[in-house]
From Swiss-Prot:
Disulfide bonds: none
Gene3D superfamilies reported for this sequence: Bira Bifunctional Protein, Domain 2 (3.30.930.10)
HAMAP family the UniProt entry points to: LipB
Protein name, UniProt field: Octanoyltransferase
Remaining remarks: In the reaction, the free carboxyl group of octanoic acid is attached via an amide linkage to the epsilon-amino group of a specific lysine residue of lipoyl domains of lipoate-dependent enzymes.
InterPro entries: aa-tRNA-synth_II/BPL/LPL, BPL_LPL_catalytic, Octanoyltransferase, Octanoyltransferase_CS
Domain of life per record: Bacteria
Organism: Corynebacterium glutamicum (strain ATCC 13032 / DSM 20300 / JCM 1318 / BCRC 11384 / CCUG 27702 / LMG 3730 / NBRC 12168 / NCIMB 10025 / NRRL B-2784 / 534)
Source organism phylogeny: Bacteria, Bacillati, Actinomycetota, Actinomycetes, Mycobacteriales
């Protein structure tokens, strides 16, 4: 996702409303609906300044979730249920072996959603690159972190982003494919993108990469990106149509 304008805040300044340290919660393997309800509770409390910003670190049992731009043709062909989420984007899958991080962050005014997403991307690009994945970056028009086509594979997404802003507080967040299966993606059109692939860090690096291996580097990178210590840079290696542009929102 490329910003069509300069961000509202200088790149080296924090996008957070508070300078207090972010509180980290490690939730382990947790049901999607339970985590969603918990996010909503925390987002309300954060909007009321009752708690500091939060990072929820977790994995989900296998589940499909559909963002507000999901189309009928995106839906699974294997008969598994889908949870309709209030985040942006289209359909995706979550499951064991995928690191999920939900930042519950009160954003500084004026709220810049595009800059927030790009800072999340920057953090994930840093983490994936530091792991040794060559060329990881952006495809303009598509959010997330991508690996260029290689060894007969097409351009492939290794990390996804889907967010919601409510009362100035961000919720939902990011998912990094570590050592999860890719089988469940075969039954949907992931993120509404039919002409690209999915990958995992384990596949890219040809070794097992656990969720736990990514936790601390991801926490540091997200904290740095939101604070402006890690500055958004140009990591684009391609461009493609935005898969959500001009699509109707689910009511």
């Amino acid at each position: 996702m490329t910003a069509p304008r300069d961000p509202f805040f200088p790149a080296d300044l924090s996008i957070r409303a508070s300078a207090e340290p972010i509180e980290i919660q490690r939730l382990g393997l947790i049901d999607y609906q339970e985590a969603w309800d918990y996010q909503a509770e925390l987002a309300t409390r954060r909007a009321n300044d009752e708690i500091p910003d939060q990072l929820l670190i977790l994995e989900h049992p296998s589940v499909y979730t559909a963002g507000k731009r999901t189309q009928p043709e995106d839906l699974p062909t294997n008969g598994l249920p889908v949870i309709n989420a209030d985040r942006g984007g289209r359909i995706t899958w979550h499951g064991p072996g995928q690191l999920v991080i939900y930042p519950i962050i009160k954003l500084a005014d004026p709220i810049d959603v595009v800059d927030y997403v790009r800072r999340l991307e920057e953090a994930l690009i840093q983490v994936v690159g530091d792991m040794g994945v060559a060329g990881a970056g952006r495809i303009d028009g598509r959010s997330g972190v991508w690996v260029p086509a290689h060894d007969g594979w097409v351009d492939s997404k290794v990390a996804a982003i889907g967010i919601r802003i409510t009362r100035g507080v961000a919720m939902h967040g990011v998912a990094i494919n570590c050592n999860n299966t890719l089988d469940f993606y075969e039954h949907i059109i992931p993120c509404g993108i039919a002409d690209a692939g999915l990958s995992t860090l384990s596949r890219e690096l040809k070794r097992d990469v656990s969720v736990e291996e990514l936790v601390e580097p991801s926490i540091r990178a997200l904290d740095d990106a939101l604070a402006g210590r890690l500055v958004v840079s140009d990591h684009s290696f391609g461009s493609a149509p935005d898969p959500t542009k001009n699509l109707p929102k689910r009511g």
